[in-house]
């Protein structure tokens, strides 16, 4: 998307201090509009927020739970640690763009991912005047929003991305939808045409508030420069409270240019939202859950991304009960994968023993999950023998797909702390003993381990991830694109802790891996960050190689290159008699050639790169990748016939699980 020149008609400053200003409230509306209550209702709401559409977006996958908000909790990160010192005098007028940047500073923002254009260049000019905020310049706005997501997923603090109006703003759409589905706290700021041009089909005008209404937790169109401090404060509060999600702030260019003396003490206007935040968990219900545990013989924990802030409390709960743990794709890392009580991932490509455990259980403890179709398969058959306990921060998720016997709408962390307190008070009295159940599951682990075959000196993709796990001691931050490589990374890397695993779960957005790794490397510069990617996903945002080079980010890219859209090929093999329908990404006129040459992309951006084709050379090649300072790309050539197994077909049940076969067989 080419950056556009500014509109010549919007270059003069507008002063809100002067009643004679051409943009005074007598000529233009001064209200900042939040979105309507519901995307299917056209009646506009009051000008203050009374409701967020938590109940609307029922298909979201968990990213994290939030802190429960109390009256004495500080909203701003900087307020928690030190008094903010402005570079402006208290009564000094400044541009709206400077107010916006200072508002970000006051929220503790130190990094943004921003791509300039005509409608946002005032914000970029203000960023150059900030000594606090660093802009990491992506090479595409989608790269910027995915990087903001990676930052948020890796750090827990809202990621910030900025784009211009029109195509710049619409390039954020996939990232906003992804953040909503995975409950990731990000704040996206877009430039907009001047207020007087809104609705005139002006150059690069897009009604981005309308476009993103159904894929954001909340959004704003700022129509009064004096609203900026409040709007930014609310945006960060909304992004990380309750069920986290993306917030969009659309700022017209004339608002950015107006002079104003900001009021930093404006209160937030969120009465409806505040009243809907989850309350403390009901103690009687917690006691009932403990009683169900004591009465069960085959309990299983089913944990999701909602547990990512509660890892220590979850571990303590498992220690007190001895209940085995199965994780969703988004929940990986909440409980150590290598622990003897871990069943690893369940669902479509989960382990046989995790799915066996859920299928055989008499009590399913579903914490921070949404009973997604990729986990449950056929709903009627999922955990059909079990009583179900569902704890979630979002009331809309409870009973949406699977009706629980006991449910609590609460912060998972507080619920776990309450359960642990009850269990500790009863220690020695409950006499929980699930050893026979654990032994049954251990036998399933022995009988149905994750495994793969080797063919000559070809490199099995699963083996590449195993070696990476060994060489990093399972401590790297891993990002992925979407496809087979994503599932193998979920299966074969042993995640030790939360915020190690960055992947597009609910939306399944290809091109996510490299930008997300950029965000993680910016937010956690002392960690090893590896993008495990597929050739199809990688090339969708390959331009971000320039970003990691220019920023000297030590992002390692391990590319599992089979020159195919591997997951679609797998389905073609299984369900379409191996008929190839545009899934070959190489050069049909020369199939012996590795095409495109990923090493040339890296070379063009000055990123060191190497290719490995033989299994015996793989370990040394990965070690060199890890040892090389700065960014590095390792092109690992793998067979396209490999299938991700186990596999429960879409809409199937545990009895339908597939454990054998690949593209070398016919079906």
Swiss-Prot record:
Primary location recorded for the protein, binned into one broad class: plastid
Disulfide-bonded cysteines: 161-307
GO biological process: isoleucine biosynthetic process; L-valine biosynthetic process; response to herbicide
UniProt-annotated binding residues for Mg(2+): 535, 562
Locations listed in the record: Plastid, Chloroplast
Needed co-factor(s): Mg(2+); thiamine diphosphate
EC assignment: 2.2.1.6
Chain residue ranges for the region called Disordered: 1-45
Region (Thiamine pyrophosphate binding): 484-564
Binding note for cofactor: Binds 1 Mg(2+) ion per subunit. Binds 1 thiamine pyrophosphate per subunit.
Matches recorded under PROSITE patterns: TPP_ENZYMES (PS00187)
Any one Gene Ontology molecular-function term assigned to this protein's record: thiamine pyrophosphate binding
Enzyme category, top tier: transferase
Recorded superkingdom: Eukaryota
Family of the protein in this entry: Belongs to the TPP enzyme family.
Note: There are two distinct ALS genes in tobacco. The enzyme shown here is derived from the ALS gene on locus SuRA.
Identification of the protein by name: Acetolactate synthase 1, chloroplastic
Annotated organism of origin: Nicotiana tabacum (Common tobacco)
